[in-house]
Swiss-Prot record:
This is D-aminoacyl-tRNA deacylase. GO terms for cellular component: cytoplasm. One of its GO terms (molecular function) is tRNA binding. Homodimer. It catalyses: glycyl-tRNA(Ala) + H2O = tRNA(Ala) + glycine + H(+); a D-aminoacyl-tRNA + H2O = a tRNA + a D-alpha-amino acid + H(+). It comes from the Bacteria.
Length: 146
């Protein structure tokens, strides 16, 4: 499982002209799921996202988590994180989990974040989405469960 985490000042996701999720300060999470991912991967990355210290303290040191900062999450499923472009010019997505496997794990990940006390907004699984965000920093971290 991979998560591209971007700290943001504001973000939203729109599907067919309708905003399906929006946050003020927090994280935008682009979430990719592969064939081998399990509930253990979900739990590991949800805990990591909740506790990662990416917010500055009074001394300017990244020392506060999103829980301490009071931010929210915008979670967007993104199978293209498992795109392989080593051969040729068209990426292969065979490492991405099939939708019937990926969607329940993405939903479980979002629920695990909520269980950590985070407010979670989402896109729509499998939809073409317009994601807008104002990067904060920018701070962008790639998290992987394996």
């Amino acid at each position: 499982m991979k998560v591209v985490l971007q700290r943001s000042k504001a973000a939203s996701v729109t599907v067919d002209g309708t905003v399906t999720g929006a946050i003020d300060s927090g994280y935008v999470l682009l979430v990719g799921i592969t064939h081998e991912d399990t509930q253990e991967d979900v739990a590991y990355l949800a805990k990591k996202v909740a506790n990662l210290r990416l917010w500055e303290d009074a001394d300017g040191k990244m020392n506060h988590s999103i829980l301490e900062q009071g931010g929210a999450i915008l979670s967007v499923s993104q199978f293209t994180l498992y795109g392989d472009a080593k051969k040729g010019n068209r990426p292969s997505f065979t490492s991405a989990a099939r939708p019937e496997v990926a969607e329940p794990l993405w939903e479980a990940f979002n629920q695990a974040l909520r269980e950590h006390g985070l407010h979670v907004e989402t896109g729509i699984f499998g939809a073409m989405m317009d994601v807008a965000l104002i990067n904060d920093g920018p701070v962008t971290i790639l998290l992987e469960s394996k």
